Amino acid sequence: MAHKEFNFHIYNTTFYGQCWKAKNTKAVIVLAHGMGEHSGRYIHIAKTLNEHDFSVVAFDHFGHGKTTGKRGHNPSFEAVLESVAVIIEKARAFFPMTPVFLYGHSMGGNAVINYALKKTTHLQGIIATSPFLKLAFEPPKIKLALGKLLQKIAPSVTIGNEINPNDISREKIEVDTYINDPLIHSKISPNFSLTFIDSGKWAIENASQLTIPILLLHVTGDKIIDYRGTQKFAENTKRATLKLYKNGYHELHNDLCKKEMLEDVINWISSQL
């Protein structure tokens, strides 16, 4: 597995990216991580995909990982979609004339779905795992009201993101690794949280506009993102393949169902080539 790091620059931000190259690349997977984490947490996925001749290109979002800027903040949702566009172009430059798939988890799942709906054709397909379309909990009303006020007067102020590390996986080692990862944070600005909540609602309502095949994977035990939002999205488009894993936790690629889930991803990608 050949690995290289790279950077790109937009919105006065230096983005950190990495590429894991397969020996014989049949397709390239552009990966977008979830809230509070970073692309380095997907090395095991990249390794498995590489073993099946799929190269992987990933990056750290605004306010995350090794990308510069204030933790948990982005300039706008449009800027998020532009960062996805740039990483896709990077992938095309690394692997010319190669089919490209977008793969997003949670927050990244929201980003790739909205990108596909608003920005693009020319993708082979999309994989979205536990996509942030609908929260599994109601944010405290006072916190939501404060967030809306701050978005108007101080959009970069950050507060806690309400994620409980114990809710990411049923495997204790994964929870401990998450807690002890120095690049993981729990910060989020109103400009980040509210725009993703709104874009998730919009995506569900406009799913019928999707023109690209999408694999939707979610777990019924997710305490962070409501799997029923993913179900509703699937119902609203003819392009979706949906699979639910019973009782799993939010990070299904780090949960007890991870082997089955990765097999499903690999089989679906292969079916789209």
Per-region residue spans from a language model:
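Alpha/beta-hydrolase-fold enzymes
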Residues: 105-189
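Short alpha-helix in the alpha/beta-hydrolase fold that links the catalytic acid
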Residues: 212, 226-235
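Short beta-strand/loop motif that positions the catalytic acidic residue
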Residues: 210, 216-218, 222
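Active-site glycine-rich loops that stabilize anionic/oxyanionic intermediates
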Residues: 26, 34-37
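N-terminal cap/lid segment of alpha/beta-hydrolase-fold proteins
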Residues: 1-21
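Conserved alpha/beta-hydrolase
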Residues: 41, 46-70
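Catalytic nucleophile-loop/oxyanion-hole region of alpha/beta-hydrolase
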Residues: 36-38, 65-95, 99
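Catalytic active-site module of serine/aspartate enzymes centered on a nucleophile-bearing elbow/loop
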Residues: 241, 246-273
